[in-house]
């Protein structure tokens, strides 16, 4: 299987997102990389499903709460930016204060 560097990055992010999802389901508090991966994956999947940029900006802020992450992690992530593939092309989605 030949993947472009961009496809490899997306696959790595998706794998990290799955790991974070499993840890969250076990009741474990997520660290910084896990939180970013989970939020990013949610945005990428929503975009792939055909949701709008505005919907994904809103949804990205509903993935995690402060109770879901380790102490101090929410403050470490002032925003998350991810390039997601929408039906009409690739767009940059920015979520400010994603962990509320």
Swiss-Prot record:
GO terms for cellular component: cytoplasm. The keyword S-adenosyl-L-methionine does not apply. It is an enzyme of class 3 (hydrolase). InterPro entries: Urease_gamma, Urease_gamma/gamma-beta_su, Urease_gamma_sf, Urease_subunit. Its EC number is 3.5.1.5. It catalyses: urea + 2 H2O + H(+) = hydrogencarbonate + 2 NH4(+). The keyword Manganese does not apply. Heterotrimer of UreA (gamma), UreB (beta) and UreC (alpha) subunits. Three heterotrimers associate to form the active enzyme. Belongs to the urease gamma subunit family. This is Urease subunit gamma. It comes from Alkalilimnicola ehrlichii (strain ATCC BAA-1101 / DSM 17681 / MLHE-1). The gene is ureA.
């Amino acid at each position: 299987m030949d993947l472009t560097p961009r496809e490899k990055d997306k696959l790595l992010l998706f794998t990290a997102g799955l790991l974070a999802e499993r840890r969250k389901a076990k009741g474990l508090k997520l660290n910084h990389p896990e939180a970013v991966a989970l939020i990013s994956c949610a945005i990428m999947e929503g975009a792939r499903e055909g949701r709008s940029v505005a919907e994904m900006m809103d949804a990205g802020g509903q993935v995690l709460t402060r109770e879901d992450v380790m102490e101090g992690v929410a403050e470490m992530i002032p925003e998350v930016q991810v390039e997601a593939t929408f039906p009409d092309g690739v767009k940059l989605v920015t979520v400010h204060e994603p962990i509320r």
